[in-house]
Amino acid sequence: MYLTNQQIEIIKNYFSDKPVNKLYLFGSYARGDADENSDIDLVFSLHKDTRISYFGLAKYLVDLEKKLNRKVDLVEEELLYPRIKSIFDREKKTIL
């Protein structure tokens, strides 16, 4: 299963006024093997010289989970562990 066009538009619209420079999908939804229990894995990078607090990140998560009716994992690209980064680099699909 992949994200629907509607889900992609919800994500794009949500981040349209946020300080996010790039946004990627990876994991089971990027590979197309997601099921009804899969979460949505998103990785973002911020505009230069921009930071986001943990509270800000938590708000993004709560908002997205409500809008998508699905658990979301949201991680800043520069904080990915090297082992995860190599998987991410192979699987990533650009959203923004």
Where are these regions (language model features)?
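Catalytic core of pol beta-like nucleotidyltransferases
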Residues: 1-24, 30-36, 49-96
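Conserved G/P- and acidic residue-centered "switch" motifs that form tight phosphate/ATP-binding loops
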Residues: 27, 41
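Short hydrophobic/aromatic beta-strand micro-patches
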Residues: 43-45
